[in-house]
């Protein structure tokens, strides 16, 4: 009888730790609020730093679990969880398609470093998901494809410097279809031309472009 095996109450902490291990993309780290009241917040140590993790709520899980090809727009004001959903979706898709590459674009170096830290904890076996600002991505392209990077221009006119690298990348890189999925956080911080340039690095078919 199945009831024999289910007679004892589940240990909520153990269940939460198990889910964090097998579905890390369903959790948010170091969040101030308790998102999902069905699960307790758990605390753990990684590399001598203490972290807390809470499972996403049902609405956020719904967006995280959906895998739709094409362009997807996620709207919402500041503090509504768009960045949390974005990272969750990016990790989910990277785990579902380990043979393909994915990339997240953010508008600031601070957020970039923060998400990289979270990614290192939540996606321990990561070798196919990158997080960049537009400038760090362009610097990577410059190094890989021997683009001419005039660092004097970088100090004098940052915007002109980036535009110059974008122009070179368009002319030099013949096959730009590098990523199955691209995720752009705080898209209002990017120019239309920059988003168009970023989009050129998607696969031609069966691609995913999420804009937040």
Q: What residue ranges belong to the model's regions?
A:
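The feature marks helicase ATPase cores and/or their adjacent C-terminal helical subdomains
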Residues: 1-212
